[in-house]
Amino acid sequence: MQPRVILTDIEGTTSSISFVKNVLFPYARKALPAFVAEHGQQPEVRRWLDAVATEIGGACQDSLVAETLQGWIDQDRKHTALKALQGLIWDEGYRRGDYTAHFYPEVAPVLKGWHAAGLPLYVYSSGSVPAQKLFFGFSDAGDLSPLVSGWFDTEIGGKREADSYRRIVQAIGVPAGEIVFLSDVVEELDAAREAGLQTRLIDRLDDYPMPRIGQAANGHERVENFQQIQL
């Protein structure tokens, strides 16, 4: 069945893992203490600081929360509060021009081609929806956000859980079998397949020097870049 809708991951799929790990994460880690001190009383920030404080044992100083968040960055923890606060920090960095978001060079032309062909594109990433919009809006290929019909993050559920994809299918409103999910993570693709979606394993040599073929692909169609995706 030919897909009618595309659902894509970002890190390791449209964009280099190294950009996130070597640029965005260190930027947020360094900025966290000052950001929390300056913006900690703003409702959109306070909400997440209080959530972290509750998780680590109740009332505690914001400086301790900031240290905890820095530790979570070091652990690459996929925590919704951390992702939300990182997104707010990255917003400042993007708008100041401190960096632009990396996209592999073939991605933007392919996305534009799908858009012109009438194929809706949705994004599902562990990064918060505001961070996703910044990533596409301030990319090194220009503003790609008009190509995206909708955004999903871990507030809808974890990316390795089939129910998350079932909820996304309901939100998009087309049969699961008509949606193709693009990701570099086999376990995410497994969950999407369990929910009835089509899948493609994005296996970029820059991010995965050892090609994942045979058993390593676990039955998912493997491509090395977006130009190889046949829809």
Curated annotation (Swiss-Prot):
InterPro entries: Enolase-ppase_E1, HAD-like_sf, HAD-SF_hydro_IA, HAD_sf. It catalyses: 5-methylsulfanyl-2,3-dioxopentyl phosphate + H2O = 1,2-dihydroxy-5-(methylsulfanyl)pent-1-en-3-one + phosphate. The keyword Transmembrane does not apply. One of its GO terms (biological process) is L-methionine salvage from methylthioadenosine. Its EC number is 3.1.3.77. Bifunctional enzyme that catalyzes the enolization of 2,3-diketo-5-methylthiopentyl-1-phosphate (DK-MTP-1-P) into the intermediate 2-hydroxy-3-keto-5-methylthiopentenyl-1-phosphate (HK-MTPenyl-1-P), which is then dephosphorylated to form the acireductone 1,2-dihydroxy-3-keto-5-methylthiopentene (DHK-MTPene). This is Enolase-phosphatase E1. The gene is mtnC.
